């Protein structure tokens, strides 16, 4: 049984030769996009022997139109990041390199964070995971739900 068959069979509730294994890690900022991201993930995959690749997304959402979000009204000024932004394309290039290298032998799962966590963790203009209770975004939602939800 190969890795793809093992994972798909386990998900479907069928018998497997062994329980599929998967674990992942966050890589340094220098390995967050492009070829460096692909190389870090592929090296980890090959050294660990996991049954699938989980691609991390350690890239902050770029705050277009402002530097940081301090007040609920700031959310109204936030603009979508262009689909063809350099950072986004570099990340997708890294994902493609991973798929090209191992997509035939293992399933590849790409991390997509939910909007609530993304908004909370990016209010400072860079990734900041210190607000584990989501107090900042929750306070903004309570104070001005329309402005916050519009983002």
What are these regions (language model features)?
Residues 65-151:
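Active-site-proximal, glycine-rich beta->alpha crossover segments in alpha/beta enzymes
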Residues 1-70, 93, 97, 103:
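N-terminal basic, low-complexity leaders that serve as flexible interaction/assembly modules and, when applicable
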């Amino acid at each position: 049984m190969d890795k793809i068959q093992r994972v798909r069979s386990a998900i479907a509730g069928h018998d497997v030769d062994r329980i599929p294994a998967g674990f992942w890690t966050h890589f340094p900022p220098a390995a967050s996009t492009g070829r460096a991201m692909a190389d870090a993930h592929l090296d980890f995959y090959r050294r660990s022997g996991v049954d699938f690749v989980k691609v991390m997304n350690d890239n902050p959402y770029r705050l277009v139109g402002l530097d940081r979000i301090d007040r609920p009204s700031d959310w109204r000024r936030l603009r979508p990041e262009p689909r063809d932004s350099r950072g986004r394309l570099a990340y997708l290039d890294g994902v493609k390199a991973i798929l090209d290298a191992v997509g035939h032998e293992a399933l590849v799962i790409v991390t997509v964070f939910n909007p609530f966590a993304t908004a909370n963790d990016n209010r400072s203009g860079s990734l900041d995971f210190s607000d584990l209770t989501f107090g900042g975004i929750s306070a903004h939602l309570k104070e001005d739900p329309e402005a916050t939800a519009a983002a």
